[in-house]
Structure formats: structure tokens, C-alpha cells
């Protein structure tokens, strides 16, 4: 006679117990990640390559091999056109409607900075943003992708002022978070050598006429002129410099701009431009990881030519997969963070061995290149900034 009351009590306990909520974006069958990116506007090519031909390329390989602990990875992307306000709206939609597990490889300092606080409040991981502002450093739910501007600046100034002994520097920069973060870093690092920027000129995003800025910089007669721009204005600047016959300055491209396709927009006006490259040559490198990337690109996207942007996205997909595999079958946002923090000496076959420290940065190096006939000629081995 005591069995029935006991069963009723047990049933009440079970039904009354709080249920453990499923982790957003994670089911028995899949993991959903997404991002707001530029699929239109000045960085459309970059956005498409780092996501649809980069991250998604690596996830195709993973999914065809059985997924991550049996789960396939699915991606959701929205276009922000490099507009911060659209990036905010897209990111909220991804989190609140699509219930993504994490945001992966969003692009551009202004859009990324605009969404940063929201994602931190929601405790949603922002993984490997393709931007350079140091504002992402050391945040629990952010793992930075690209070499940050202050690290890039340190490598650039140490090489140009320290090794090559240039003394007079100027900068043409984009008037936003991207440009200003580099400008501040250049001033700080030049100060270590008792130097400063002797001239600076700013441009707005999307500008097509930079003739006035180039004329003013030319008049300052710098030995080195930094280009802290997106591709369109950079091409206009290089063509204008060629047009006025300005040959006695070394044009130096920042890492986010240093790609053959984008510098080729300036055609032969890009010859002789130097800069900090963040990725090995995707077409010719014999590094094992780059060879695999090329083989997978040929298999899955045979019409898409290998490039540094899709290689960066492929690398981001690799790091996400490594973190999620380490986190185990019981994947949560916090377990992913802990797993990524455990990466030490990870061999990717693409970049030097990776250790992720408290700063959550995944890239702290670059190497110096010069544009010759629309290709990069390496001038140094890896330069590092610790």
C-alpha cells in the first residue's frame, strides 16, 4: 500500500525539478554559429572570403569527417555593409532569434567595437574578429583573430626605425576606430626612438578623392608614409601619388590592407609598396597546413582562387573546431572559453605554434613584404611582438 504514494511523490519531484536549459545553438545534431559581416560595400570581397570560402571551407571538411563529437556545424551570416548600426541589429538577431552558440569572425573595427559590449553582456563568445582595435584584448568572451594594431605598430616601427633607420614618418589614415588605433600606436612606438609622425591626414570611409591629402603629405616630405585605409581609398591614394610623381617616400601598408588582390586595385601604382603581411602566401607556401587548405579549396570550391582572406577564415574554423573538440560532448559557451584558454603550442601548419594566453590573442606576428608585379616578395622571417 505504500508503493502508490511513493510513486506519486517521485513523479512530483521529477516534474517539479527545474529543467536544465539547452545551451543556445547546440543540439544533439548540430552547433550553430554565425556572424555579421560585409557582403556589400568596401569590404565585400573580404567578408565573403573569410566566411563562405574560409570558415565554411573548414567546417565542410569537419562535417564530412563526422562533425565535432557527432555534431555538424552550421553557419548563419548577415550583411552589415561595414556599417556599425547594421552590425548591431544583425548581431542582436543572431543572438535573440537565431540563438547562435557564438559569433565567429565578424569584420571591421567599427562594426566589431559597436557590438562588443552587447555580446559581453549576453556572455556570447566573439571568436576571432577580423579587426585590429586593441579594445578586444583580455575580455573573457572575446578571442581576437587578427594581429592587433598596437602589436602591428611595434613590429613595423622596430623594423623601419630600428633596423632600416628611417627618421621621418607620415600617415594617411581612415577617420574611425581602425585608423585612430593605428595612429595612436604609431605615435607611441615612434616615441621610443625619439621620433614622431611629422604629418597626418585623415579620410572618411568610402572616399574616392584623396588628392588634397596626398598633396599635403607630399609637401611634408616624409621618408615613410603609412596607409591605414581600406582597399578603395588606398588604391586612390597610390594612383594619386603616381600621378603627381611622388617617388621619394616609401608607402607602407598596414596588415589589414596587405593583400595582393586589394593592392592590385592600384595596378602598377602598387609596385614598391611594402607592408606587414599576417599570412603566408596562400598560392605558393609549402607549409603543410597551407597545402591542405589549397587541396580542400580545390575540392569544395574549385572556382575560388586561394587568398589570404579565405586562409584567415579557414584558420578561424580550425581554432573553433579545436576548442569545441577539447570542450567535449557537453559543450557550453563557458566550456569553450576554458578549452580555448588551454591551447598551448598548437601546431596549425599555417602560423608559428599557437599559445593562447590571458590576453586571448591568437595572432601576434607578421612578416615584411614588398609588392613586385602584383605579388609579395618576403623581406623578413616572422617578426613577433610579445
What are these regions (language model features)?
Residues 5-17:
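Bacterial N-terminal signal peptides
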Residues 20-24:
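Boundary at the C-terminal end of the N-terminal hydrophobic targeting segment
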Residues 25-56, 78-84, 107-108, 172-180, ...:
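Extracytoplasmic "Venus flytrap"
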Residues 26, 30-32, 46-53, 60-136, ...:
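Beta-alpha junction/loop-to-helix N-cap segments that form part of ligand/metal-binding clefts
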Residues 45, 50-57, 61, 86-93, ...:
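Extracytoplasmic/secreted proteins, especially bacterial periplasmic and envelope-associated proteins
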Residues 53, 97-201, 250-275:
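Extracytoplasmic ligand/sensor domains, especially the bilobed periplasmic-binding protein
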Residues 238-313, 370-372, 376, 381-386:
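Extracellular/periplasmic periplasmic-binding protein-like sensory domains
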Residues 299-311, 321-375:
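Segments of small-molecule ligand-sensing domains
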Amino acid at each position: 500500500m505504500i508503493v502508490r504514494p511513493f510513486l506519486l511523490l517521485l513523479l512530483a519531484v521529477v516534474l517539479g525539478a527545474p529543467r536544465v536549459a539547452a545551451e543556445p545553438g547546440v543540439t544533439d545534431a548540430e552547433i550553430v554559429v554565425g556572424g555579421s559581416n560585409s557582403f556589400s560595400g568596401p569590404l565585400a570581397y573580404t567578408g565573403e572570403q573569410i566566411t563562405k570560402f574560409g570558415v565554411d571551407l573548414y567546417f565542410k571538411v569537419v562535417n564530412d569527417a563526422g562533425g565535432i563529437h557527432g555534431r555538424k556545424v552550421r553557419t548563419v551570416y548577415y550583411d552589415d555593409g561595414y556599417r556599425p548600426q547594421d552590425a548591431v541589429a544583425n548581431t542582436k538577431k543572431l543572438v535573440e532569434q537565431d540563438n547562435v552558440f557564438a559569433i565567429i569572425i565578424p569584420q571591421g573595427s567599427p562594426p566589431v567595437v559597436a557590438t562588443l559590449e552587447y555580446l559581453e553582456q549576453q556572455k556570447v563568445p566573439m571568436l576571432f574578429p577580423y579587426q585590429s582595435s586593441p579594445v578586444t584584448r583580455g575580455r573573457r568572451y572575446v578571442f581576437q583573430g587578427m594581429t592587433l594594431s598596437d602589436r602591428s605598430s611595434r613590429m613595423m616601427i622596430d623594423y623601419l626605425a630600428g633596423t632600416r633607420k628611417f627618421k621621418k614618418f607620415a600617415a594617411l589614415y581612415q577617420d574611425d576606430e581602425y585608423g585612430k588605433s593605428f595612429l595612436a600606436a604609431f605615435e607611441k612606438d615612434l616615441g621610443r626612438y625619439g621620433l614622431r609622425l611629422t604629418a597626418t591626414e585623415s579620410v572618411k570611409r568610402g572616399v574616392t578623392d584623396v588628392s588634397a591629402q596626398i598633396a599635403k603629405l607630399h609637401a611634408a616630405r616624409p621618408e615613410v608614409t603609412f596607409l591605414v585605409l581600406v582597399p578603395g581609398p588606398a588604391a586612390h591614394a597610390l594612383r594619386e601619388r603616381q600621378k603627381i610623381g611622388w617617388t621619394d617616400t616609401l608607402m607602407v601598408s598596414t596588415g589589414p590592407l596587405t593583400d595582393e588582390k586589394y593592392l592590385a586595385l592600384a595596378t602598377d601604382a602598387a609596385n614598391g609598396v611594402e607592408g606587414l603581411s599576417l599570412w603566408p602566401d596562400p598560392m605558393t607556401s609549402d607549409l603543410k597546413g597551407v597545402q591542405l587548405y589549397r587541396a580542400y579549396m580545390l575540392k569544395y570550391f574549385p572556382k575560388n582562387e586561394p587568398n589570404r582572406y579565405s586562409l584567415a577564415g579557414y584558420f578561424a574554423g580550425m581554432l573553433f573546431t579545436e576548442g569545441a573538440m577539447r570542450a567535449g560532448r557537453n559543450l557550453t559557451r563557458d566550456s569553450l572559453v576554458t578549452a580555448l584558454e588551454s591551447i598551448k603550442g598548437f601546431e596549425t601548419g599555417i602560423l608559428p605554434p599557437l599559445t593562447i594566453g590571458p590576453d586571448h590573442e591568437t595572432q601576434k606576428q607578421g612578416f615584411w613584404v614588398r609588392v613586385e608585379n602584383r605579388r609579395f616578395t618576403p623581406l623578413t622571417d616572422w617578426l613577433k611582438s610579445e
